């Protein structure tokens, strides 16, 4: 091999005539002498400008760094024979060459060195200064130990990593590198390494997971040796569309002629393509024939994995007003944020004389209007006072429905005169009174509730059956009701009836009434448990809802796990129906549709889990207990202020730590429910104590992909578990995504029987009730898959949680 100015010549592989390249064991090389190297030195932040020219001006040239073609980006630009790099960093150090296009001929070579300080060429210059200060012999020592404190380095795959061990000594020490305790050289790694001895550094480009390990620099001279070990962790890139920082860019209103800036922060593992767009009109229309809006591209560029992009508009005019879009896309998908720019045009100033005249007139008008209003108010007060005295004598108390068996000490049921048949307003309003102790309601038989003809069912048409389950304050029984089905009024229908227990309090009564009224307002949907009727007159309160014969989704899935495993309920019993992968996707899709409907009704569930989804005889998923949620109307969050029982393992971090509930926190819970579905009723975070769970969630840990789950569905789960609530998908988006997955899924794709589900199941079950309302109830039985308040007698044939 030939060297030019101490630099090895280029090696070019040559294929001999008539020879198959693939058949050779090792390539032959043709030695090509390179032109001399121009050595140039720059300081971090400066601009590099290099040039070369071919003999023929029409010949195209290209630029390479360390033998690899240079791709223009936001810092690097190339033109015919010119290379420009702005804001250089130490990573820009290397060998640059100018070559003829489609040729191996090199026109010019440059050795570029980028240093930290203008006064020194490299780290070794500082070391020489240290050596000049003393004539004593000394062992090696670190010159910049503060830059070596970070010993654990984690980077995404395909990034460039550099380890540095700047040192000094007399005589000047040498440096070599070890990986996992063994000598490390370029041939040990695909892609090779770069050893920059003058900078005491090791550089690896485009790292991959196999590059993980411990890297040790050994610095030594004849008087001693020192070493430093770095741990490298290479993270797999996640397949995720770009993420835009919430709240950016925001709407702005500026004065005509001023300047304005919009910021858009983009996060993406894959390099994103970022565009700034403005909505425009074409021939008076904002939309094209295909329904897509017309837009003009203001800016467009490709950048790194974390980008803070800015759109600057100078001296804005009325034509700048309108809707804008920041759009980012990678090979996974697209994310965009719309915002508006409004232009304020100040009115021209009025002449001084006219302004004074207008001001005087305004004061006069104001005085006259104020006097008139005061006079009218005085007249109204006098008339009201005169009418009030006789009205007291003639007033008679209207008839009031009274609670005949017990007083409501803490809360009172107040009556409305209008029916709820044609109104979304609750018929029964709960008002809080000042008294307090949660009195027990023994032997409840009559309530002073108003008659609602739309929902009322005569007790004579209802036949109660066997109990289905009971909770902390209520119970559910199966029943036969006549007249529920309007098309077949004389045919009995099977329903579930919610009622209070004997030891229920007035608070429990209030909750059941509120749940009934909430179900009235929310309306009907195929994928929620619908209200069928109520018995409110001449006896205890009965709330009739749809009956789901196959019980909760969690028990439904567990009962249909593949046979022959230790986790089966009965090892000798084969499930009546075997689930396919499409069945599981269908379950997820139906629950998403139900939650999409509840979200459209401004209803936050707060306790979405497989145990609160019921399954009908036709395998229809129905969300239950949403009536216990809060109607948020104009406020998109509900902040819990009491220390009630909380389903910890299903709760979003903002709900867990800040007690803030939104539709976004319901989406997090839906992600956990997805995990339950694809583990066939597994317990989330198996084996992890609650205290440890808090810590793991804060650190960003998430559950692993279930065995019977595709990568696409797992990425949907991970999107539901995004740390930023506003970045989680809406239920509408989840419905669209799952509908697409459902469409392309085969109906014959059965589950993998080799997967053991015991890893997702708790080690034991406990059937007793844990209805404590104390602060510690959240942690009392974390090994159970359900929240701490469990039903006492859970059946599998249609029990509806209360």
Swiss-Prot record:
<keyword id="KW-0732">Signal</keyword>
<dbReference type="Pfam" id="PF07714">
    <property type="entry name" value="PK_Tyr_Ser-Thr"/>
</dbReference>
<protein>
    <recommendedName>
        <fullName>Fibroblast growth factor receptor 3</fullName>
        <ecNumber>2.7.10.1</ecNumber>
    </recommendedName>
</protein>
<dbReference type="InterPro" id="IPR008266">
    <property type="entry name" value="Tyr_kinase_AS"/>
</dbReference>
<feature type="glycosylation site" description="N-linked (GlcNAc...) asparagine">
    <location>
        <position position="214"/>
    </location>
</feature>
<feature type="domain" description="Protein kinase">
    <location>
        <begin position="462"/>
        <end position="751"/>
    </location>
</feature>
<dbReference type="InterPro" id="IPR016248">
    <property type="entry name" value="FGF_rcpt_fam"/>
</dbReference>
<dbReference type="GO" id="GO:0008543">
    <property type="term" value="P:fibroblast growth factor receptor signaling pathway"/>
</dbReference>
<feature type="glycosylation site" description="N-linked (GlcNAc...) asparagine">
    <location>
        <position position="251"/>
    </location>
</feature>
<keyword id="KW-1003">Cell membrane</keyword>
<feature type="region of interest" description="Disordered">
    <location>
        <begin position="116"/>
        <end position="148"/>
    </location>
</feature>
<keyword id="KW-0597">Phosphoprotein</keyword>
<keyword id="KW-0472">Membrane</keyword>
<feature type="glycosylation site" description="N-linked (GlcNAc...) asparagine">
    <location>
        <position position="87"/>
    </location>
</feature>
<keyword id="KW-0393">Immunoglobulin domain</keyword>
<feature type="glycosylation site" description="N-linked (GlcNAc...) asparagine">
    <location>
        <position position="303"/>
    </location>
</feature>
<dbReference type="GO" id="GO:0006915">
    <property type="term" value="P:apoptotic process"/>
</dbReference>
<dbReference type="InterPro" id="IPR050122">
    <property type="entry name" value="RTK"/>
</dbReference>
<comment type="function">
    <text>Tyrosine-protein kinase that acts as a cell-surface receptor for fibroblast growth factors and plays an essential role in the regulation of cell proliferation, differentiation and apoptosis. Plays an essential role in the regulation of chondrocyte differentiation, proliferation and apoptosis, and is required for normal skeleton development. Regulates both osteogenesis and postnatal bone mineralization by osteoblasts. Promotes apoptosis in chondrocytes, but can also promote cancer cell proliferation. Phosphorylates PLCG1, CBL and FRS2.</text>
</comment>
<dbReference type="InterPro" id="IPR007110">
    <property type="entry name" value="Ig-like_dom"/>
</dbReference>
<dbReference type="InterPro" id="IPR011009">
    <property type="entry name" value="Kinase-like_dom_sf"/>
</dbReference>
<dbReference type="InterPro" id="IPR000719">
    <property type="entry name" value="Prot_kinase_dom"/>
</dbReference>
<feature type="modified residue" description="Phosphotyrosine; by autocatalysis">
    <location>
        <position position="750"/>
    </location>
</feature>
<dbReference type="InterPro" id="IPR003599">
    <property type="entry name" value="Ig_sub"/>
</dbReference>
<dbReference type="GO" id="GO:0008284">
    <property type="term" value="P:positive regulation of cell population proliferation"/>
</dbReference>
<feature type="topological domain" description="Cytoplasmic">
    <location>
        <begin position="384"/>
        <end position="802"/>
    </location>
</feature>
<comment type="similarity">
    <text>Belongs to the protein kinase superfamily. Tyr protein kinase family. Fibroblast growth factor receptor subfamily.</text>
</comment>
<dbReference type="GO" id="GO:0043410">
    <property type="term" value="P:positive regulation of MAPK cascade"/>
</dbReference>
<feature type="disulfide bond">
    <location>
        <begin position="52"/>
        <end position="98"/>
    </location>
</feature>
<keyword id="KW-0053">Apoptosis</keyword>
<feature type="domain" description="Ig-like C2-type 2">
    <location>
        <begin position="140"/>
        <end position="233"/>
    </location>
</feature>
<dbReference type="InterPro" id="IPR003598">
    <property type="entry name" value="Ig_sub2"/>
</dbReference>
<feature type="modified residue" description="Phosphotyrosine; by autocatalysis">
    <location>
        <position position="714"/>
    </location>
</feature>
<dbReference type="InterPro" id="IPR001245">
    <property type="entry name" value="Ser-Thr/Tyr_kinase_cat_dom"/>
</dbReference>
<dbReference type="InterPro" id="IPR013783">
    <property type="entry name" value="Ig-like_fold"/>
</dbReference>
<feature type="binding site">
    <location>
        <position position="498"/>
    </location>
    <ligand>
        <name>ATP</name>
    </ligand>
</feature>
<comment type="subunit">
    <text>Monomer. Homodimer after ligand binding.</text>
</comment>
<dbReference type="GO" id="GO:0017134">
    <property type="term" value="F:fibroblast growth factor binding"/>
</dbReference>
<keyword id="KW-1015">Disulfide bond</keyword>
<keyword id="KW-0829">Tyrosine-protein kinase</keyword>
<dbReference type="GO" id="GO:0005524">
    <property type="term" value="F:ATP binding"/>
</dbReference>
<feature type="transmembrane region" description="Helical">
    <location>
        <begin position="363"/>
        <end position="383"/>
    </location>
</feature>
């Amino acid at each position: 091999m030939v060297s030019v100015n101490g630099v090895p010549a280029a090696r070019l592989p040559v294929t001999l005539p008539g020879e198959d390249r693939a058949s050779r064991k090792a390539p032959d090389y043709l030695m090509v002498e390179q032109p001399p190297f121009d050595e140039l030195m720059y300081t971090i932040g400066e601009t590099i400008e290099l040039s070369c020219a071919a003999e023929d001006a029409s010949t195209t040239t290209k630029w390479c760094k360390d033998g690899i073609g240079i791709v223009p980006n936001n810092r690097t630009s190339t033109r015919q024979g010119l290379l420009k790099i702005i804001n250089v960093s130490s990573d820009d150090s290397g060998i640059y060459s100018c070559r003829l296009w489609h040729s191996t001929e090199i026109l010019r070579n440059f050795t570029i060195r980028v240093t930290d300080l203008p006064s020194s060429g490299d780290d070794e210059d500082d070391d020489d200064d240290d050596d000049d200060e003393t004539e004593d012999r000394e062992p090696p020592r670190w010159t910049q130990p503060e830059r070596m404190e970070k010993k654990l380095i984690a980077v995404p795959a395909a990034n460039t990593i550099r380890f540095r061990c700047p040192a000094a000594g007399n005589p000047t020490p040498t440096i070599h590198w070890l990986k996992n305790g063994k000598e490390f050289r370029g041939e040990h790694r695909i892609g090779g390494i770069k050893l920059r001895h003058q900078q005491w550094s090791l550089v690896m480009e485009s790292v991959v997971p196999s590059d993980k390990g411990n890297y040790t620099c050994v610095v030594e001279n004849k008087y001693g040796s020192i070493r430093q070990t770095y741990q490298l962790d290479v993270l797999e890139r996640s397949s995720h569309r770009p993420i835009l920082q919430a709240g950016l860019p925001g709407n702005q209103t500026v004065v005509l002629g001023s300047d304005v800036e919009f910021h858009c922060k983009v996060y993406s593992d894959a390099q994103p393509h970022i565009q700034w767009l403005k909505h425009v009109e074409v021939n008076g229309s904002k939309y094209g024939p295909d329904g897509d809006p017309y837009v003009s591209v203001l800016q467009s560029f490709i950048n790194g994995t974390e980008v803070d992009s800015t759109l600057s508009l100078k001296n804005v005019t009325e034509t700048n007003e309108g809707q804008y879009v920041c759009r980012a896309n990678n090979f996974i998908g697209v994310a965009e944020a719309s915002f508006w720019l409004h232009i304020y045009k100040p009115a021209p100033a009025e002449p001084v004389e006219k302004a004074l005249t207008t001001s005087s007139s305004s004061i006069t008008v104001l005085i006259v209007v104020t006097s008139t209003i005061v006079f009218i108010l005085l007249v109204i007060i006098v008339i009201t006072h005169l009418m009030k005295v006789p009205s007291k004598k003639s007033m008679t108390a209207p008839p009031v429905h009274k609670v005949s068996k017990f007083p409501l000490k803490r809360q009172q049921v107040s009556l409305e005169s209008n029916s709820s048949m044609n109104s979304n307003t609750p018929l029964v309003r709960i008002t809080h009174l000042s008294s307090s102790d949660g009195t027990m309601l023994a032997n409840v038989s009559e309530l002073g509730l108003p008659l609602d003809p739309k929902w009322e069912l005569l007790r004579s048409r209802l036949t109660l059956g066997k109990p289905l389950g009971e909770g902390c304050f209520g119970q559910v029984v199966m029943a036969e009701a006549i007249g529920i089905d309007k098309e077949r009024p004389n045919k009995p229908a099977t329903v579930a009836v919610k009622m209070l227990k004997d030891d229920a309090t007035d608070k429990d009564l209030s909750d059941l009434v509120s749940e009934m009224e909430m179900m009235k307002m929310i309306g009907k949907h195929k994928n929620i448990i619908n209200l069928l009727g109520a018995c409110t007159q001449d006896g205890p309160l009965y709330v009739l809802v749809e009956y789901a014969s196959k019980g909760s989704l969690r028990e439904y899935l567990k009962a249909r796990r593949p046979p022959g495993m230790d986790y089966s309920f009965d090892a000798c019993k084969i499930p009546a129906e075997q689930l396919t992968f499409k069945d599981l996707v269908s379950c997820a899709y139906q629950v998403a549709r139900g939650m999409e409907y509840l979200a459209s009704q401004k209803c936050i569930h707060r306790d979405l889990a497989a145990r609160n989804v019921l399954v009908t005889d036709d395998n229809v998923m129905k969300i239950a207990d949403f009536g216990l949620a809060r109607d948020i109307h104009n406020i998109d969050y509900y902040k819990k202020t009491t220390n009630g029982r909380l389903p910890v393992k299903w709760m979003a971090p903002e709900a867990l730590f800040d007690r803030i509930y939104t539709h976004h926190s319901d989406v997090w819970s839906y992600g956990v429910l997805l995990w339950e579905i694809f583990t066939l009723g597994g317990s989330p975070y198996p084996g992890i104590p609650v205290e440890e769970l808090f810590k793991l969630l804060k650190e960003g840990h998430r559950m692993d992909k279930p065995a019977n789950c595709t990568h696409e569905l797992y990425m949907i789960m991970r999107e539901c578990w995004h740390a930023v609530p506003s970045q989680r998908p809406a239920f509408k988006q989840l419905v669209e995504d799952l509908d697409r997955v459902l469409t392309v899924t085969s109906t014959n794709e059965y589950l993998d029987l080799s997967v053991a589900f015991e890893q997702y199941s708790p080690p034991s079950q406990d059937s007793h009730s844990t209805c404590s309302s104390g602060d510690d109830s959240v942690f009392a039985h974390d090994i159970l898959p359900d929240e701490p308040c469990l039903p006492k007698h859970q059946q599998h044939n249609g029990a509806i949680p209360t």
